[in-house]
Amino acid sequence: MEPSGGGLGPGRGTRDKKKGRSPDELPATGGDGGKHKKFTLKRLMADELERFTSMRIKKEKEKPNSAHRNSSASYGDDPTAQSLQDISDDQVLVLFEQMLVDMNLNEEKQQPLREKDIVIKREMVSQYLHTSKAGMNQKESSRSAMMYIQELRSGLRDMHLLSCLESLRVSLNNNPVSWVQTFGAEGLASLLDILKRLHDEKEETSGNYDSRNQHEIIRCLKAFMNNKFGIKTMLETEEGILLLVRAMDPAVPNMMIDAAKLLSALCILPQPEDMNERVLEAMTERAEMEEVERFQPLLDGLKSGTSIALKVGCLQLINALITPAEELDFRVHIRSELMRLGLHQVLQELREIDNDDMRVQLNVFDEQGDEDFFDLKGRLDDIRMEMDDFGEVFQIILNTVKDSKAEPHFLSILQHLLLVRNDYEARPQYYKLIEECVSQIVLHKNGTDPDFKCRHLQIDIEGLVDQMIDKTKVEKSEAKATELEKKLDSELTARHELQVEMKKMENDFEQKLQDLQGEKDALDSEKQQITTQKQDLEAEVSKLTGEVAKLSKELEDAKKEMASLSAVAVAPSVSSSAAVPQAPPLPGTSGTVIPPPPPPPLPGGAVPPPPPPPLPAGTGIPPPPPLPGGACISSSPQLFGSTAIPPPPPLPGATAIPPPPPLPGDTAIPPPPPLPGXTAIPPPPPLPGATGVPPPPPPLPGSVGVPPPPPLPGGPGLPPPPPPFPGAPGIPPPPPGMGVPPPPPFGFGIPAAPVLPFGLTPKKVYKPEVQLRRPNWSKFVAEDLSQDCFWTKVKEDRFENNELFAKLTLAFSAQTKTSLAKKDQEGGEEKKSVQKKKVKELKVLDSKTAQNLSIFLGSFRMPYQEIKNVILEVNEAVLTESMIQNLIKQMPEPEQLKMLSELKEEYDDLAESEQFGVVMGTVPRLRPRLNAILFKLQFSEQVENIKPEIVSVTAACEELRKSENFSSLLELTLLVGNYMNAGSRNAGAFGFNISFLCKLRDTKSADQKMTLLHFLAELCETDHPDVLKFPDELAHVEKASRVSAENLQKNLDQMKKQIADVERDVQNFPAATDEKDKFVEKMTSFVKDAQEQYNKLRMMHSNMETLYKELGDYFVFDPKKLSVEEFFMDLHNFRNMFLQAVKENQKRRETEEKMRRAKLAKEKAEKERLEKQQKREQLIDMNAEGDETGVMDSLLEALQSGAAFRRKRGPRQVNRKAGCAVTSLLASELTKDDAVAASSAKVPKKSEGVTTILEEAKELVGRAS
């Protein structure tokens, strides 16, 4: 039998070389080897030293020397005490430390033994060596560690291999660490070789003992790894972890349980780091070898029917893979992959199992998942705030799915979104529900992906519906608030209108009082005057009464005296009566007629003959007829008011003498027609004031027609001449400009056709039967072409055929269906003649005007007479603003309409546009009528545009005067400004210009991080919070800033002018000749209402100007120099800047707070990380000296109890907050950098910027976590 000391041989030569000595230089008492005991003791001490130092020396992969492996030294029966007496105290201490390690004592128990005396230590070492030698001789008398290695390499199979493995497992569990070290890397390599062979053979043919042998090897590995030496040796192998992963076979539950536990223990090892990633790599390699999902064996184990221990082991391995990872993305990715394989449904079944170990693992999984979910949600929320642009987000998503398997699914999602019901109320609810569903899918409550193999998704619909109901209520409240705001504006407008009306009534009442008071004063004065006059009259009456009485008395006396005198004078008067001459007759009595005075001389200077004596009763005698051959002398002109006697016609052959011109006021006498053969003499022009000259008589046959004379300036136009007599030459045509010029005579004046370049031939002239719609292209003429261009080579006539032209005529005919139908009804030769008739030529309108008018009429599809009736009736139900505007724009000029109205008899021969002109030409005063109708249609809109502007400025003026908080802000600004300007020329100010408020941000702080505006905003926040309410009190300042007082005045003046024009048109409008003409009736009422509206607007505008002027006096500025728009624009800008300063102050404080919390969180996270590391090292410290045993048992116990996974929730939450804070800071900095880059480059690359923010934020959050 080989003694125990022989088991220390493997690898010793290699280790001795590393220490700088050869194996032959071992301690010995002599070179002859005579003292066998001392040699054995020295040999034993060297082996113990080598065993002690083996943990700190990396095992080489080369196999030890076989000769050395087979050699062994026997302790024999040497007395141990005698042997220890020959070694030094230092060597005893080395053996004592090795004894403590083999005894598997912890540090607390080792410390008291180290404090013992050297004599006691020597005795203890002696007893331990003696006991160990006896036990080893008893236990390993049959089989040593090297023998196990030889047997494993001998190719045992089936039952023999199973027996060997069971014996090896017992030896590994019962022997001390030194025995395990002797078994070492060679024994481990032998076990792994057998395990690999069994795995490979199992894939081909599986024997009865293969699974049992594999399981027994896993148990041997567990026993081998129950100390730090075994774990390190296992980790140094290349395929050890992979073989453990391959051993996870759900078909062999017990073996899979042990393999999963071993892998779980390896995942939570503190050193080396990232052991869980090595296990994941091994699982990935196995999945690639077997072409399955890497977590599929774990899912199969969790779905196994009976073995609860297997389910616990698989879930324990899942927790061990996820929990140690520091990166949040890594943990979420692993959970997502597991959920995608169906873990979510399996978890529901596992929660129904009543098992303490299962409950521990489920709690660990749920708690860690919830924390990761909140971490991820917080990080994504911060990043999402920077991604509020639809185009950028869509482009990012499109780039991520482009040219991948997800692209058709993304397209399908977009297509389904197009199917959302197009309802104003329902569409937002659809999108809310879709958003919540997507959020719960991609951000599962456990931070994992759903099971994509099952369409069943567990979504909290009830919670979503409740939230949607609440959001709907909020939206309804917001809509109601908006409606109330509109009502408030309307009430405010009505209040201003009532104030203006009330002020007007007050002014009218005061004016009426003043008028009545004036009338009263006038009546009082008149009454006083009447009373005075009455008194004067009474006095005069009394005076006159006395005089009358006196005169009456004198009259009586005179009568008496006359009576007496008359009696005395009777006789003398009778005798002298015959000598008195006869008195002339009174006017109006009959008597001799006094001859009239002679008439005035004629214009030629001839003296007229004396008039004959008048006949009785004043009857005039007509003049005698002229003598034969004598000159026809006209009678003398009649006096004013007498009846004109026409002269007799001249005798044949006599020369016609024109009558003298009539005197002013007389009726013009038409001249007689000229005699045959005589030259027609034009009549003289009438004298000023006389009536128009009648048209000249028609020329006699054979005479030459003389054109009528032109009318005198200011006189009426001449009527058209009568038609000529038969046989007489025609009347010469009118001069150019008075009508359509006649066509040139055929056959005369046609120039020769020019020769076309490049061999071009003139294009064929087509004559369609009806006019077609004409394409509006840019025509090329021959001079525009070049020799090599395309158009010189075209031969379009090869496509010419009658069928093509017929189709074109049918499809693009410019005539309406009605006219075509009428033509179809006509039969025989008339139908053919109509079809061959040429296109109707324009007679009055030019082609452009006619075309524009035709296009306009084509958009209405109304008969012309109906359009006329609508305009006459002023039917606002049919008339629109655009229609009237186009009518005014396209309507021909009045002269053209007058000319078209004269062609009424030729209506059917006119073009459509001219037919419309004929119909509309019958409407009296058409253009003024259309302008008035247009103004009526636009009036309400004008009022609605002007009134809100007046109300906004008026309300803004009142708000500024009443706002106490704004006044307080001005006071604070004045205080701060005077303090800052102390010692300068601007110190001691009593006030400042309002425009200075916008310049507050120009004054920066010393550190350039704050402005005076930010300081005032922060001052108001801390000490005067009520002042922050002033923006709400100036609600109408924004609307007032958009009002131009100049434009407002112009609009009012324009409205006044338009109302006056309409009123004048209505007054001057002729009497209606058509019963449908309602223009005057409707416009009269409109003018009255419009005038009232205008007066109201004018008063409101006057009130606005008064308030603004008072505001200028209040804030000390000149309203004439500072317009309404400029003043309120400054206030509006200051209001916005103040609100922005408040937000920036809040953001700055939040940033400082985040930085402070991030710093504290970082320090705390580092502290927690160190504590966590220490806790993990408490399980096992792989870097500590010594060969600690029971390591695997401790790890498995920590995994089972959940102690290996426990961590305080506080650090994770703090880390999340810290990560969010740092993410926000980084995102803001990157945004600023992007903004600067964008301002310089003008065209930033949006997708790259967003990706950079995501990557940097993700990296930073991972570091912070």
Curated annotation (Swiss-Prot):
Bias-annotated ranges (Gly residues): 1-12
GO molecular function: actin binding; identical protein binding; profilin binding; small GTPase binding; transmembrane transporter binding
Annotated positions of the Phosphoserine modification: 22, 1247
Disulfide-bond pairs as recorded: none
Assigned GO CC terms: actin filament; brush border; centrosome; cytoplasm; microtubule cytoskeleton; mitotic spindle; neuron projection; nucleus
The keyword Oxidoreductase is annotated on this UniProt entry: no
First-listed, main subcellular location of the protein, grouped into a coarse class: membrane
Modification Phosphothreonine, positions: 761
Tissue: Expressed in testis. Present in Sertoli cells (at protein level).
Residues with PTM N-acetylmethionine: 1
Subcellular location: Cell membrane; Cell projection, Ruffle membrane; Cytoplasm, Cytoskeleton; Cytoplasm, Cytoskeleton, Microtubule organizing center, Centrosome
The family this protein is said to belong to: Belongs to the formin homology family. Diaphanous subfamily.
Oligomer status and interactors: Homodimer. Interacts with the GTP-bound form of RHOA. Interacts with RHOC, PFY1, MAPRE1, BAIAP2 and APC. Interacts with SCAI. Interacts with DCAF7, via FH2 domain. Interacts with NCDN. Interacts with OSBPL10, OSBPL2, VIM, TUBB and DYN1.
Protein name: Protein diaphanous homolog 1
